Structures are given as C-alpha cells and as structure tokens.
C-alpha cells in the first residue's frame, strides 16, 4: 500500500523504519467490519518502535536498578546509561556547557510549569491576594497567537503580565507587531518571549531565532516550545552569538519510539538563582543532620533531579532521538512536504471541506480541516469506523488560535463560553 498514488524514493526509504512501528498492520472491527488501523495522530503522540522496546527489554532490562549507587554492576550500568542518554539529548539540541538539562512529568506541560517555578514566577493561589508586585519589576511574557494551551495558560497563572503578539494580515507571526510590544514594555526588567516553534493545528512555523535575536537586543530572553516540531526538525539552541535560545522544552513522547518518556527542559544556567531545589528530596543534598542542618548539592542538574530519576524514560528519549537522527532530518522534512502536497491536492477537491490556513502550504505535516454542518466528533468517529483513520477533533488545546483561524469575534466567543459553561459541551 502506498501513501501517494506513485511510490516515491522517500517512501521506499522510510519503509525500513515504518515496518518496525508497533501496530503498523493492526486491524480492528468497527460497525462497518474489519478495518486496518491508519494512525494520523502523530502531532498528539508518536508510536512505539519495536527495536527500541526490544533494546530496553533485552539490553537495559537485566541491569535495571536505582541510579543512586555505583558500587554494584546494576547500579553502575544504569547510572552510566542515564548520563550517556542525557549527553545524547544535549548534543541533539546543540546545548553548550552553560546549559542545564532537566526532565520531568510526561511532556512539555510538566517541564514548562517546573521551569516557571524555578524562575520564581509561580506563587501559591491562596497567597496571591497578599502579593503586590510593582509594574517596574513585574515580568512581561510575549506569546504568539498560535500557542498550545500549555505555553499560554501556564504563563497566565504566573506573576507575569502576558501579551499575545498580534498576527499579520496573512495569519502569520508578525515581527513588526512583536517589536512594537517589546518597545511598549521596554521599561520592564524581566522580558520573556515564550513561543511555539510550530503550530500544532496548522504546522505553520515561527521565526523563533529572529525573535531570540530581538529579545537579546532588548535585554530579554527567549524560550521556545518544540513539542510539535521536535520530532521532525533540527533543534539548534546556539546557531550564533545573537540568535541563541535561552531555554527550550519538548515532548519526546511525540517522537517515533517516544511514548512513555518524560518532558525535556534545557535552559541557560544563568537563569537559575535558587538556593532550594523545586523538588527537595533524595539525591539533592550533600549532607543532613538531626538538628535541621542540610546542604543542597551545588550542581544544578543533580539538585533539580530529586528522588529516583526517570532513568528509563531518559534512556528511551535518547534512543528515540538517535532514531530521528538515523532517519535524517532532511529526509523527514522532504517526505513531509511530499505528503502535505498530496493531502492538499486530495482534500481541496472535497466539497464542503475547508482546510484551516489553506493559503499556507509551507508547513510541517499538520493539517486541520472542518466539514460544513458536520460536528467534529462525528467526523472523527466516521473516519475511525469507516476508514480506520486515527485522528482527533476539537480545538487541539489551542483555543486562542482557533479564534484567529475561524474568525471568532468577542461577541460570538462570549456566547460560546456561556453555552459551554451551562453544560452544552457539544459546542466545545
């Protein structure tokens, strides 16, 4: 079975990897009979890869042990594998000696929230009414109009002010509007741009290195969310001395072979000002005594790795990254362009079907559409039952971007909010 009408050289190249995806030939019985499962929900999560699962089971499995010891063969093996995996991750994103790697949670959401706590931007909800921060020292965060909720709502719950950078007339990231906002808040002492590298709804990319350059010229910092694009693009934290990224976060579970991994955060250690780790516990202290005395480890990565680390998760992340590198980023992008062109050609001929941001075909392989007078969940169910296609409906955790794409004005938005609040979840 071919993905396009004619098998291309790239399709033939990727067959060697595709055949090892667990479930690639899976079938199930729907109301319409036996269907072959066709997975197209990669933007949400990747798929298990048999060689990685077998390597974890057969090569690492026999030596699984806690990493907090190096006096046994098992403890030493896991500790060495854990540290080697961390080095693989750092090298993949072109981190330098000043960058710190932290893994946490199950994806980008966990690490961006942890990072906000590390930066001292989160306070307990019951203490907010007692906290008054002068405007001059209140952080300002700039986000794009295309953010996933994780890189929007999490910032809204910090002590910072948050500004959405207006899109340009074509619905793209607008550097001119961004510069205006930076100038507007030039008096703020802590300026942050936290933007997605690519929309998880349309696959449209942002000029994040240019954003970083502008932030650095204005004494600010730039954080980039690679959750959507990470499995497919080069991640380069240090392309030059001006456009470097101060922090990145991504979700390895979206990689081929990545489900079951932790979120990844890499950031410049100069942003770390803390004496106390975010998660004090085992492995974070040099010593304690019965009288309340204690000293935390100086090394930031060790100090912020409290408790038994997710060593298998980190090892699996490194294996998924090595698989990405073996496939080749340019091969991945070239194949994505083939598929995007093919899907556009086929869907644009379907009556009453509208591709969102269809004027922008220069994108990663993320395509969202709606069908006139058809509820999205019914559409997803039909695709599943009739054709075996695995996808998802709804706003894809990007409700703000949905307003832009569907031209939802404030009055319509408020009406929808009222209906949803009253329990009419079909409108959601």
Regions found by a protein language model. Give the residues of each.
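Pyridoxal 5′-phosphate
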Residues: 1-428
């Amino acid at each position: 079975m071919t993905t396009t009408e004619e098998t291309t050289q790239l399709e033939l190249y990727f067959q060697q990897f595709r055949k090892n995806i667990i479930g690639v030939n899976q079938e199930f019985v729907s109301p319409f009979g036996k269907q072959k499962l066709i997975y197209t929900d990669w933007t949400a999560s990747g798929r298990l890869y048999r060689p990685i699962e077998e390597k974890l089971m057969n090569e690492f499995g026999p030596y699984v042990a806690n990493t907090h010891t190096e006096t046994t063969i098992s403890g030493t093996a896991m500790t060495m594998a854990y540290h080697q995996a961390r080095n693989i991750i750092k090298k993949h994103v072109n981190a330098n000696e000043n960058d710190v790697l932290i893994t946490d949670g199950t994806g980008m959401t966990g690490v961006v929230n942890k990072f906000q706590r590390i930066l001292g931007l989160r306070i307990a909800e019951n203490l907010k009414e007692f906290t008054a921060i002068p405007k001059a020292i209140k952080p300002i965060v700039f986000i794009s109009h295309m953010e996933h909720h994780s890189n929007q709502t999490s910032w809204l719950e910090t002590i910072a002010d948050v500004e959405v950078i207006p899109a340009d007339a074509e619905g793209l990231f607008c550097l001119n509007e961004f510069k205006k906002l930076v100038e507007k808040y030039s008096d703020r002492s802590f300026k942050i741009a936290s933007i997605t590298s690519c929309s998880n709804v349309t696959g449209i990319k942002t000029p994040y290195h240019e954003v970083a350059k502008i932030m650095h010229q204005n004494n600010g910092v730039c954080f980039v969310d690679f959750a959507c694009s990470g499995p497919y693009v080069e991640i380069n934290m240090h392309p030059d001395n001006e456009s470097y990224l101060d922090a990145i976060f991504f979700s390895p579970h979206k990689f081929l072979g990545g489900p079951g991994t932790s979120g990844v955060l890499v950031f410049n250690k100069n942003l770390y000002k803390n004496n106390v780790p975010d998660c004090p516990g085992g492995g974070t202290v040099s010593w304690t005594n019965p009288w309340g005395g204690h000293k935390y480890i100086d090394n930031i990565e060790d100090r912020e790795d409290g408790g038994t680390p997710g060593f298998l998760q980190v090892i699996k992340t490194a294996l998924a990254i090595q698989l990405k590198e073996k496939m080749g980023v340019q091969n991945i992008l070239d194949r994505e362009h083939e598929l995007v062109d093919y899907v556009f050609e086929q869907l644009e001929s379907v009556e009453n079907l509208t591709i969102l941001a269809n004027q922008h075909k220069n994108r990663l392989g993320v395509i969202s559409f709606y069908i006139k007078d058809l509820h999205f969940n019914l559409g997803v169910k039909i695709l599943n039952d009739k054709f075996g296609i695995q996808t998802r409906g709804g706003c894809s955790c990007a409700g703000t971007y949905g307003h832009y794409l569907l031209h939802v004005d404030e009055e319509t938005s408020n009406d929808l909010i009222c209906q949803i609040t009253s329990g009419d979840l079909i409108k959601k």
